[in-house]
Amino acid sequence: MAAHFSGALQLTNLDDFITPSQECIKPVKIEKKPGAKGLAKIKIESDGSYVQLSEDGGKSKLQKAEITLNDCLACSGCITTAESVLITQQSQDELFKILDSNRKLVKEGKGDVQKLVVISISPQSRASIAAKFNLTINDAAKKLSAFFKQLGVHYVFDTTFARDFSLAESQREFVRRFRAYQQGDEGCTPMLASACPGWMCYAEKTHGDYILPYISSTKSPQQIMGSLVKDHLASVVGKSPDSVYHVCVMPCFDKKLEASRDDFYNDMYSTRDVDCVISTVEVETMIQDHCPDFNSIDPVELDKLYCSSDSGDFFGHSGGGSGGFLEHIFKYASRELFDEKVDVLTYKTLRNKDFREVTLQVDGKDVLKFAAAYGFRNIQNLVQKLKRGKSPYHFVEVMACPSGLKFLAQDLFGPTFYPTLEPRSLEKNVQQKNGVSCIFI
């Protein structure tokens, strides 16, 4: 798994990649042993473990250094590369620990105290799995449901409803902000889309209080799903939030950082809205290890937290990939604020393909100006314009990765699988073949 753990680390020719700080501000404490002196060598054993060889020929096994995601968030070093350190709380291993514990409790006759294990699958991950195994969207979802339930998972959900909710609230939030801007409150715009954890880390660590008021306050679909599972589902099945173990399957590794934030921690029950995030790549590894004949597995319908479709088929939205925020909010705001119906957005590429803008004109006057800024090079330019009061935009969709979710389209295939793929990503490409399109994570 380590070789696949960060898609970003596998890419080349990336000119705005931010490397970690030279010195970690949360270093591992080294215990000095009495009598230790002289030089020592470190050797890697055949099983991959590290041992220290002293001058007198002695050998001692070295303890592996560990760091939690909360430590990562407190560090001033890496931004999008935090997953390159050893993560102990957000991995498939943690899920298997819970499932193993549940099996032991059931054997001991204590099944009533086992954790209720819930998995929520994002449309992008579902689409990547469908493409990987040459399945339709619906078949991939049902086979994933069957696979996870064979492992011992109790509920498997789709996150479409949470995405609908997040999108609708983002639309309303922008209209509120724009109307306040029209009344003279210039601090309300531009509204910056905030579902990208890498961007959020950068904004908080680098620009702090200055930039935060511009960032949308709407929860991401992942965290909305977390609230629904830990509050609504838990109450429906008669469980407390801390007795529910919630896992989200996401295409973006930085969603692990988002789930680990203290903002989404319930102090009363000492639990997080999302206990664990596993990436699409990790799910593929799980399938290879536990269900090599994945295509032959008997399908099982996904569970329905809220019913999105009577037929059970998935539905989506136009504006797939990274463009979900911008396109839907632009169309909604055009209709709500100016009574203008916009069917197709015409983008204008500025300095590079990762910085595009779209404008609504009424009577020859620009009344709405939106932009999409992907990658830290463009983000830094945007922030500098904001600080100088030179930003002309009312809304900006921000993604830390260059090309937005094009990064995530390569999570199972590598950068050469779709070499000419546009930023709308593999997810939209695959889903539209099945009559479905998606928005954001």
Curated annotation (Swiss-Prot):
Binding, [4Fe-4S] cluster 2: 196, 252, 401
Cell division listed as a keyword: no
GO biological process: iron-sulfur cluster assembly
Molecular-function annotations in GO: 4 iron, 4 sulfur cluster binding; metal ion binding
InterPro entries found in the cross-reference section: Cytosolic_Fe-S_CAF, Fe_hydrogenase, Fe_hydrogenase_lsu_C
Binding site for [4Fe-4S] cluster 1: 24, 72, 75, 78
Domain of life: Eukaryota
A single GO cellular-component term on record: cytosolic [4Fe-4S] assembly targeting complex
Keywords: 4Fe-4S, Iron, Iron-sulfur, Metal-binding
Family under the similarity heading: Belongs to the NARF family.
Function of the molecule: Component of the cytosolic iron-sulfur (Fe/S) protein assembly machinery. Required for maturation of extramitochondrial Fe/S proteins.
Protein name: Probable cytosolic Fe-S cluster assembly factor v1g210509
Record organism: Nematostella vectensis (Starlet sea anemone)
Organism lineage: Eukaryota, Metazoa, Cnidaria, Anthozoa, Hexacorallia
